[in-house]
């Protein structure tokens, strides 16, 4: 399934810009999408990472948040695959 994982790079965005971009991607995610991988980076601080984890924990479209081995990436799991 080519569309099963969507990626969104929010490097350099403000928290407001990043939230707007993430919300738009979540709205457009089709039924074949089970994961939104957000690339936020970590060398410039944790503001974006912290915002993602705070704002999307408990979001109606997000089943859970996964933190991988790469500290600059957070996955929003939309459904189980």
Language-model features, listed with the residues they occupy:
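Long, charged, low-complexity intrinsically disordered regions
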Residues: 1-81
